[in-house]
Amino acid sequence: MKISFFVLLTFFFFFSFFSLLSSNEQSTKFDSSINQLCDDSDSLIENSNSRYFDNSYSLNYESLYSFRNGITKTIPQRINILTPDAQQWYRNLENIVNNSKQTWDPDRFKDNFDAKIILKNNDFLCTMNGRIRFTGDYMDHVLKKENMYISSLEVSLNEGNILQNRKFKLFIPRTRQGENEIFMTSIFQELGFLAPTTFFVEIDFNGDVNTYLFQEKINAEFLQNNNLKEGPLLESNAPPPYKWDDKSIDLARIVNETWLIQNDINFQYGFKSLEIYSKLRIFHDQNNNSLMDLNYERIDTISASNLRQFFLLNVALQNYHSLTVDDRKYYINPQNDSIVPIFYDGGSHFLNTKHINYQPFTYAENEDYGEIILDINYLKEIPILKQKINQIDLDKLANLLKDRGLSQENIDFIQNNLIEELLSRLDKIELVISNNHIKKENSVLDYFQKSEENLNLNYIVFKDKENFKICSPDLIDCFTTNLSYDDQIKLLNGRLKIDDKIAFYVSKNLDSLYSKNSMNEMFEFKENIYGIDIFSNQKINYEINDKSRLIKIKPKNQGKYLISNSELDNVTIDLSYDELSKLDSENNFDEARYDKTFYTGCLNIYDSNMKNVSIKVTNSPCEDSVNFVRSKGYINSIEINGSKFDSIDADFSEILFMNTLILNSGNDCVDVSKGEYKFEILNLQNCFDKGISIGESSTVRIEEMSVSDSYIGLAIKDSSEVDINFYKLTGTEYCYASYRKKEEFGPSKLKINQVNCNDSKTFSQPDSFIVVSDDS
């Protein structure tokens, strides 16, 4: 009876669904803004129906701002999902079950269904439109419950987000070994590896409540949440698991197609990223487990070290499922060609078998895992991994696991035994590492001809400039052709078929495939000055003053400079470009914003600590005059004049700016995101767009700020919080603006103690939290 009632109820939602899609349009002068999170017109469900929509949060939110911002930052206990076409949804699940009794092919039934995703807290309600579909490769993703089926889901939100995720998976817990998946993703994150955030959540699906595993999808938002700039995300382009074996061709494909098509630089780099993976996979050891083995000899040493540590940790925790090639995922950093592993679908029973004596390479009765050979190169990584394990903050980890739903019994075990257990397991692994193993490397032909079937199923593709060489896997029959742009995208995405055969991109040519990859190829020039390694894409012409520790660099046009993983102490950097003519400026517009270095700044400071640093940049032709990424410390003074685009851009950083003077920026004078920033004195003049732009969940404190002759003095966006003591502006159209620009964030909070807007306009979306004392 309950389900029948919900069929009627959801019919009402289906009737109103499409009218809602167009009711939220908001007309503003801010073209980049989007609707407020959970627009009020979406909240159709009155409190009289609250019996069906229990509270999603145990926290008591006192304001609309805190509730909506909490959606982006706080783990929900319950998510309500309604499907307008509930009958068709359940019919689709029945078809999946019936199909499994014949030939299991779940992709036939992964259709998208419209849905409403609802979060509630006391009197506050948030309704978001989205789509859901079945997800999973095996029948364990469908569960029969009484007279109906439930399944694992993939949810895509048309607008809004949950915990900064617009796309996420909801797994039936048994498909990911329940609490084990929460623990595994959390411990990998704690040790500095990439892993999707995972936690238990109650799902009320059309009135039926069950516990699921919420897991963020590995996409652009995942990279952003891990303080990484977007680049290619790779996974194996293997046949479905029920068809894949050790004879299959299983090279990679790029899954984030949106990044590929943003510009030609990204598109061209896509081919290089797949070549990097080909170097890993093709030359695997013939004597090793062919379903798991990779070859690290042709990639950079830092990536190889990280990959070996990742493999060791998975072996210690018995995540053998995630080590099979078809389940592995990678991020390729286009700035240095490094390849970074991503934990996914471990399959471990660690928490269920924690009291059983551990033996390496044993997992239930699976003999395949006993075929793994770890060579002597793994020995040097064990002490490094042990050091990381010894530095685990167990109290912090325990609190995180509690929030994500782990039982107290397992949390107690982790706090009392985890470090000792992991160190003991690594000791046992060390004993089985082979000191005298001699690798027998696959050749290209060995890999592609593992099975005669590959000749009938596949083509392999090489790209030399604009021409593509299409070959049979035995490299005997080849022809040269041009591929359209759309076909090239399909090739990179693993969807291209030629004569009904799957086409795998390999590399530029065989010589390129056999050569070793190295980091910082674009920044081939290097100088060490005052103990600081400075890299550049051109010869570094500089002068120094030892008394003032001044480094004065005179670059040629489009010269870029990189300082990475450094300690900058009591140093001044002066970067002065020749002023571009108007013609040169117009001709080099795209080159300045997008180039093959993938660094946006003229001066790029990455992963570094700064103390008493001063910076001066003049006539910057780059997207950013200075770009700080994942850096910390304080800057005594920074002065920038004549930037073609942005002057200061800071991402994922924690920086104190003492004295900041920006003059004549072609776009924003200051742009900060995803970090914590403090400005003592901030003077911004003649900023073409914004004086300061603050976004992506940043926290900013400004003691004294003045803005003149700009379009917008202060823009605060996307879950950011800003506290300003004194703010003065002149000749500026908008004093401040508070709005959402990206769907994965929520409203922002602005507090100004003293401001003189001088009759300038203001703009704020209704759910912004604004406290301003205007003295004008």
Language model regions located:
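C-terminal catalytic region of ATP-dependent kinase domains
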Residues: 318-319, 331-457, 464, 492
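Conserved ATP-binding subdomain of kinase catalytic cores across diverse folds
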Residues: 119-254, 319
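Extracellular beta-rich repeat passengers
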Residues: 504-776
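Active-site acidic catalytic loop and adjacent metal/ATP-binding pocket
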Residues: 81, 155, 299-351
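Bacterial N-terminal signal peptides
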Residues: 8-16
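Regulatory N- and C-terminal appendages and interdomain linkers associated
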Residues: 2-4, 17-127, 409-548
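ATP-dependent phospho-/nucleotidyl transfer catalytic cores
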Residues: 219-316
